[in-house]
């Protein structure tokens, strides 16, 4: 399979997702076939705002010219007003994600590319929602890891959206081991690295300084690393986060595992925010998302940067091909 079929889910309809999707399909793709799971009227309105062509096709059709986009319609209750989210449309946003995921699980599609979703708006609708990563993991009934990547760096997270005061209690040996196994498997299978070198950051300053600045490294991190190294995994650390991202050290890693959100992601975003993407490791299909928010203040103005969506789509296509080739070999 060298031309995978990918679901394209714009996310929050009042944000920049729809117009970024319109920009994405202005050039026919050679690496994948895209099927949008979205509200047709919203996409048409985005195309009109950008003064770009858009021809919506049946979901099984092939895109043949600029602006062609097969679509599995997810109609909204109320018309979209760019910049003004409507909680009444939140069920359609969730339905688009769930239907796309179901099609991937059943083999009709080979991966999902997602735009930014507005968590607060979905929760205001009465739907409990913590994030797309968690939603897809629950639907697939599997453990997942969030990884953000750009052309220079890959950073996976042991914990994601938690208050900082809660992080030490959440990081258990079982959680850390599960995270490292998922990252190692993904680096081997999805990214084709036979023996990935994974840098693991410590939780505390200076990785605990031998216990003087916290015992989590001694009590949790080091025993897990020793156990997994005995199985053959190449794990570096625990490393002090303040020097782990020096360029001379990064050349020795294939991925970095950070203990919490703001330990690793500021460095990644500083090194290449426009090309950064969010990858969900551990799902039975590739899912790659943009690494930015809904940008309600930019929606409908035609000024939003599509670079992250372009990068997410290209990477998702490559990962889908890697999975197919791995399946053939096994």
Swiss-Prot record:
EC number(s) recorded for this UniProt protein: 1.1.1.262
Disulfide feature: none
Pathway: Cofactor biosynthesis; pyridoxine 5'-phosphate biosynthesis; pyridoxine 5'-phosphate from D-erythrose 4-phosphate: step 4/5
Residues reported to bind substrate: 133, 269, 278, 287
A Gene Ontology molecular function term of the record: zinc ion binding
Swiss-Prot/TrEMBL keywords: Cobalt, Cytoplasm, Magnesium, Metal-binding, NAD, NADP, Oxidoreductase, Pyridoxine biosynthesis, Zinc
UniProt GO BP: pyridoxal phosphate biosynthetic process; pyridoxine biosynthetic process
InterPro entries the UniProt entry points to: PdxA, PdxA_fam
List of residues binding a divalent metal cation: 161, 206, 261
Cofactor: Zn(2+); Mg(2+); Co(2+)
Subcellular location: Cytoplasm
Keyword match Magnesium: yes
Predominant localisation class: cytoplasm
Chain's role: Catalyzes the NAD(P)-dependent oxidation of 4-(phosphooxy)-L-threonine (HTP) into 2-amino-3-oxo-4-(phosphooxy)butyric acid which spontaneously decarboxylates to form 3-amino-2-oxopropyl phosphate (AHAP).
Further comment: The active site is located at the dimer interface.
Similarity comment text for this entry: Belongs to the PdxA family.
Binding partners and assembly: Homodimer.
Protein name: 4-hydroxythreonine-4-phosphate dehydrogenase
Gene coding for it: pdxA
């Amino acid at each position: 399979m060298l031309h995978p079929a990918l679901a394209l889910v714009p996310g929050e309809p009042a944000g920049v997702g729809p117009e970024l999707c319109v920009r994405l399909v202005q050039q026919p793709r050679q690496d994948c076939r895209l099927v949008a799971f979205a509200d047709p009227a919203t996409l048409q309105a985005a195309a009109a705002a950008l003064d770009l062509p858009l021809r919506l096709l049946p979901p099984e059709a092939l895109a043949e010219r600029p602006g062609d986009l097969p679509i599995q319609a997810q109609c909204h209750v109320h018309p979209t007003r760019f910049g003004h989210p409507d909680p009444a449309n939140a069920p359609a946003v969730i339905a688009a994600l769930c239907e796309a995921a179901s099609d991937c699980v059943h083999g009709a599609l080979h991966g999902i590319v997602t735009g930014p979703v507005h968590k607060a708006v979905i929760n205001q609708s009465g739907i409990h929602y913590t994030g797309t990563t968690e939603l897809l993991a629950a639907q697939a009934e599997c453990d997942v890891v969030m990884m953000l990547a750009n052309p220079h760096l890959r950073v996976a997270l042991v914990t994601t959206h938690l208050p900082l005061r809660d992080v030490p209690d959440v990081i258990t040996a079982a959680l850390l081991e599960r995270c490292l196994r998922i990252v190692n498997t993904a680096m081997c299978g999805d990214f084709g690295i036979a023996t990935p070198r994974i840098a693991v950051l410590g939780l505390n300053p200076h990785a605990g300084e031998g216990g003087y600045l916290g015992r989590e490294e001694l009590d949790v991190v080091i025993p897990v690393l020793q156990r997994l190294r005995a199985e053959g995994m190449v794990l570096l650390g625990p490393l002090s986060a303040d020097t782990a991202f020096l360029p001379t050290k990064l050349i020795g890693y294939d991925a970095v595992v950070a203990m919490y959100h703001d330990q690793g992601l500021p460095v990644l975003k500083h090194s290449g925010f426009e090309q950064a993407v969010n990858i969900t490791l551990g799902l039975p299909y590739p899912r790659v998302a943009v690494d930015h928010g809904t940008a309600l203040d930019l929606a409908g103005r035609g000024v939003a940067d599509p670079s992250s969506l372009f990068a997410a789509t290209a990477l998702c296509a490559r990962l889908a091909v890697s999975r197919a080739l791995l399946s053939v070999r096994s």
